[in-house]
A protein has these predicted regions:
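Alpha-helical scaffold domains
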Residues: 1-148
Length: 148
């Protein structure tokens, strides 16, 4: 894909018509081939699937740069729901740092799991700790970051 200098249209075609392996290859190539947010629909599609390999591939550096706060928070929760290790989420430390809305969402999820007698994923505690530190990226309020 990189050698072919595939544009967003070509990447979309390969992703849409490709196998799971080809879709993952497209997602991994995005940060190297698409400088702006034009390929976000591919990331969003992968995050809607139940294929944990696609979800993990979708959360690379491209998503870290281009997903808005709302989408990114829900992607982190999807990882917890589906068992995708949060080590696969690019730029997790920076994006989670100081994110009080993510902290609230994580606490709610942990409470639901506990009330249902289910274990709370270990990754949740690590990310919750990250939300307690202030990151420069989250030092100012994001008008679109508030969940409803």
């Amino acid at each position: 894909l990189h050698a072919a200098r595939a544009d967003t249209e070509a990447l979309t075609r390969v992703y849409s018509q490709g196998t799971a392996d080809e879709r993952r290859a497209v997602l991994y190539a995005l940060p190297h081939l698409v400088p702006g947010p034009d390929a976000l629909p591919l990331v969003e599609d992968a995050l809607r699937t139940n294929d944990t390999r696609l979800v993990a591939a979708a959360l690379g550096p491209y998503a870290a740069r281009h997903l808005d706060a709302h989408q990114w928070r829900h992607a982190v929760l999807k990882c917890l729901f589906t068992g995708v290790p949060l080590d696969r989420v690019a730029d997790l430390d920076r994006r989670a740092g100081g994110d009080q809305e993510l902290a609230r969402m994580l606490a709610d999820y942990a409470a639901e799991r506990t009330a249902a007698g289910r274990p709370v994923p270990e990754d949740l505690h690590r990310v919750l700790a990250l939300t307690e530190s202030l990151s420069p990226a989250n030092a100012t309020d994001d008008p679109h970051g508030k969940e409803s």
